[in-house]
Amino acid sequence: MSTISIICALAENRAIGHKQELLWHLPNDMKRFKNLTTGHVVVMGRKTFESLPGGALPNRRNIVLTSMPEAMGTTCIACATMEEALECSEADKEIFIMGGTGVYQEALAIADKMYLTHVHTTFNEADTFFPDVDYSQWEVVSTENHPADEKHIYSYAFVEYKRKK
């Protein structure tokens, strides 16, 4: 059985994007994302897929949830439902859910783990948000705090959660 993991960077007001772009540039967060997801399945919505600057993420099996699978081309696997996406991924030991909002909302009910980057600021201009999480259902496995520096304009924390049994 695969582990279903949500991966996301979010601001204090749960902001995750504006006009289909990230709100910040945190190189260490991008490096962590790449290290965790490389070699695994990544599941995302169509808008998230379309926002990727280079299209499908390399060295990962890209699954896109969309009601228009015929429009997705050959760089990814198009699935109509989360259930179908998970069936396509069942051979992988860990499946990463990488957004957007609706996909995260659906995944919260079934996820085993969350890898969240908590960015210590708010973005009032955001138009895309991570769903509300009932953190009482989650146990913190690890926390790694990072101050702002010359490459990272905001302080942030990498927090790994696992669902309480």
Predicted segments with their positions:
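Extreme N-terminal starter segment of soluble prokaryotic enzymes
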Residues: 1-6
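Flexible, gly/pro- and Lys/Arg-enriched active-site loops
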Residues: 8-41, 46-165
